Structures are given as structure tokens and as C-alpha cells.
Amino acid sequence: MKYINKNLTIEKVNVQKIAKKYGTPTYCYSHKQLTENIKNFKKNFSSFSPLICFAVKSNTNVSLIREIRKLGLGADVVSIGELMMALKAGIDAKKIVFSGVGKTSTEISYAIDKKILLINAESKSEIIEIEKIAKLKKKIVNIGIRLNPNTDAKTLKQISTGKKENKFGVDEKTFFELVNFTNYSKNINLKCLSVHIGSQILDHKPYEKMLNVVNKIIKKSGHNFEFIDLGGGMGISYEKNSKKLNYQKYNIAIQNFLKSQKAKIIFEPGRSIVGNIGFLISQVIYIKENIKKDFIILDAAMNDLMRPALYGANHQTIPVVKSNNISKKTYEFVGPICESTDKFTTIKGFQKLKEKDLVVMCDVGAYGMSLSSNYNLRPKPPELIIKGSKINIIKKRQKLKDLI
């Protein structure tokens, strides 16, 4: 994304032309950026060739997942719907891992039938259910056990998953009990130790701590794991000059870990693969100036992009047509939904805007459309993928007749 003659472009496409043809709000994805992200991720960990399973929850568009599959990735899924979507996108079942704390018997049965690589179990009750279903089907099922390493990922509490108060995984004592339990099962093959400490992680040190905990527990368990699933969580820079994850140091920590563990590493990245490929184009409906606060009211809303309302997350917001006419006022960029939390960002010194002007919210490729809803009975926006000068519609705009 860059400005050419003060006009914002995504790859080789003028954003104004996109808005004119497809309307607003509209999601756009850069294929070039997607390709670069996957290439760089593989390069960062090329010394041990991990299995990279894209976290489907971050973006569930089947066309986008097909592109990700073509670039060599598998899938991490957390529901039967995501598993179906991954298979529909052509991802090899042997490159799919099924995570999540609340898999139903229907979901477990479907995963077994599809012969996916691993079901990562998160409780004794779940393992008992897997064993029961596998026994009925007369099959042996490969599973992992998700460990909760009680490691602070130094991220937002809403997206922390590796501390003892979080619902995910099992504690050390329970982990050893479950390893022992699976040793006596005729229908379960314990292949993997799984761990995932959080999302939007920008510091390598929590990963180092996590690896130390995992290493000690594996040695203590005496079990030979074929796979170590380290989850994902690698963060991206949502704001200018923000901190970036040091992949080199994380890579070194994993290489040191692998000196004593002869297992295949699995990653489950989502945000780091698709986060910065996405842009949400929106139009100014009204400019509302009050005594205490001034507002830019957009046609995009929290139902289109939930992260700011849900986490207090901030997405860089920029004008589509650049101007040197800067306002001295502070504006809050909000949507039309009847909730006070329907706001995106607050900016002082933004360029002066008028009604029908266009803005773009950046880095919305992960947990943007996948968290969207029809709240206030608003149709969901379309999704486009841009390759050079070509625009492909990968999901059409919903119509009111589809909702009413």
C-alpha cells in the first residue's frame, strides 16, 4: 500500500476506484503481501522446517485459504465448520490439527473420519470421549495434549491463553496423569505435546520461558513425542514505530530446544500470515462537532471490525486522498451502530475531512471479517483480493434480502 500522486493504492489498484465500483465498507487483501508473509515466516524457521498450520479462525475466507494452501501451509482449526472450510480449500487432512477446549462428539467423530493429523485434547473428559468414539469406529486416533505452561505472554488479558487462570490446556500434574492414561489406551496414540500462550506477542522472552517449561516436562514425562506444537501468537505492528517480535532470537531458542528433543515442530500462525494484508475501506457519512467531543461518523461499524470494541485494539486509519490541510481538532472515528463502544480510533491532527471522503483502516486481515456479525441487522461487507492490477471478488456483499 502506498500513495501515488496523493492517491492511495493497494498493489497497482487505486482505492478510490475500488470504492466507486464495489461500494463501502469493503475489505481488500493484498496477494503480494500474503506471499511475502508466508515466504518470510518459512525463512525465519528454515533451519528446522516446521509444519506451518494456518490458524483458520483469523480469516475464514475459503478463497484466501486456497491461496494459503497453494503456498504450502496446512491448517489449525477449532470447530467443525473451520475443519470443513479447510478441507473445502483443498488442504491435506494430514496437515490439519484440531484445537479448542470444547469439541463436541460430532466434531470429534468428523475429525476422526477425515483422518486429520492430530486432535489436540485439552482435558481428561475430552480424551475419554475421543477414546470412546475411536473404539466404536475401531480406529486408532493420533492426539496431542495441550499443556498450560503458566507463562505470561505479556499481551492483552483478553488474548492470553497460557496462564493458570486461562481455560486452555491442562496443568503439569494433570498432564502427567493424561500421558499415563493414554499409555494404556488401545485406541489413542499420543503423538504431540501442544502449547499456545497467547496472541499478538511482540516479545521473544515469553516464548523462551515456554520452551524451558516444555523441555522440563517432556523429560519428566519420559514420553517420546513425534510433534511439538508451539501454537502461534506472533504479533504484528499495528502502529508506526511499534515493537516487533525478534524472530531470530525465537528461532535460536527453538534450535537450542531441539538439541534435546527430536520432534517435528508445528506452528499455528494466523495474524502474522494475514494481519497486514487486509484493509477496510470506509466512507465518511457525517462530521459531528459537539461541545465536548467531535466525531467522524463512518459507514463501517463494529459489526464490520470488532477488534477495537472487543479489545480496545487500534488500527492505523489513513485518508484515501492525501492532503496537507491538517485539522487542529481531535476527532473520534466511530460507526453508526447504537453502542457507545462502536468506535475505531481517536486522532489529533488528521487531515480535514468532509462528507463522502474515504478512509482506510489498516492491518485488518486477521480477526476482521472472521469476527464480523450482522448486529443491527447490517449486511456484511464484500471481500476482494488484489493481485497487481487485478481485483477478484472472493465474497460478495450481503444483501438485506438475505437477512430479512
What are the residue ranges of the model-derived segments?
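Conserved, mostly hydrophobic/aromatic
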Residues: 34, 57, 79, 111, ...
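Short acidic, glycine/serine/threonine-rich loops at helix termini
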Residues: 65, 88, 108-113, 130-133, ...
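A charged N-terminal "starter" segment
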Residues: 1-141, 180-189, 216-224, 389-404
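Charged (often Lys/Glu-rich) extended helix/loop segments that serve as interaction or gating elements
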Residues: 19, 253, 262-404
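Active-site loop/helix belt of alpha/beta enzymes
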Residues: 150-287, 350
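Active-site-proximal loop/turn and secondary-structure-junction residues that shape catalytic pockets
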Residues: 56-60, 81-82, 102-104, 123-125, ...
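Structured core elements
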Residues: 74, 97, 118-120, 144-146, ...
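Flexible loop/turn segments at secondary-structure boundaries
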Residues: 60-63, 85, 152-153, 199-203, ...
